[in-house]
Amino acid sequence: MSTAEATREENVYMAKLAEQAERYEEMVEFMEKVAKTADVGELTVEERNLLSVAYKNVIGARRASWRIISSIEQKEESRGNEAYVASIKEYRTRIETELSKICDGILKLLDSHLVPSATAAESKVFYLKMKGDYHRYLAEFKAGAERKEAAENTLVAYKSAQDIALADLPTTHPIRLGLALNFSVFYYEILNSPDRACNLAKQAFDEAIAELDSLGEESYKDSTLIMQLLRDNLTLWTSDNAEEGGDEIKEAASKPEGEGHS
């Protein structure tokens, strides 16, 4: 084993250790080292999932914080507590700076290493979907021209991923389904296009249902779980109380072969 291979193996092990300890910032650091290793070629499925899990947890904590603070800000504004509102705005800006830094970090890594080195269709879709996801996270809190740019970048990345997925991945593939799920969330939440969101989610669900019998045992659980999330969103978006926003919109988990919501 070469020194580079040994270092790569050690960083992967340390990333798993950091995950067990729920030290996700360090998990990101270890997996970035793996991704940036010279002549590394494509990451293995395990490695790309570790990278995805690391970043999703780091960004997820800040996204949750931002939503909570934004909700409190709205309540205080409605009560006319201007002194509090100013402090909350300042605090929210701090969280937004952290969000921007995290998104910029993974987007640079995707553009410089991960997307260019991807050769298999599955890898290309995985990384382009990831690129779309992190541009979408920027669009969630940016305003004006920056929001418009983030939304446009999201659309380009998701469409590029979709083109490859439709051509090369089965309708029941967890990564293809996860892409459809997150792309539909983008249409609903960022572009305010509920009809497009529902059409995309319904088509992905219906196409997968038609091929469910041909699904191998290996990905059956992963695929059906994402299909359930697609159906949950469709139910929420088409119900009378969709506008009330009481329920959480579901997104693909940090790794398509995994569990959970955003």
From Swiss-Prot:
Pfam families: 14-3-3 (PF00244). Induction: In response to penetration attempts of powdery mildew fungi. Residues 247-262 have a biased composition (Basic and acidic residues). Gene3D superfamilies: 14-3-3 domain. Residues 240-262 are annotated as: Disordered. It comes from the Eukaryota. Belongs to the 14-3-3 family. PANTHER family: 14-3-3 PROTEIN. This is 14-3-3-like protein A. It comes from Hordeum vulgare (Barley).
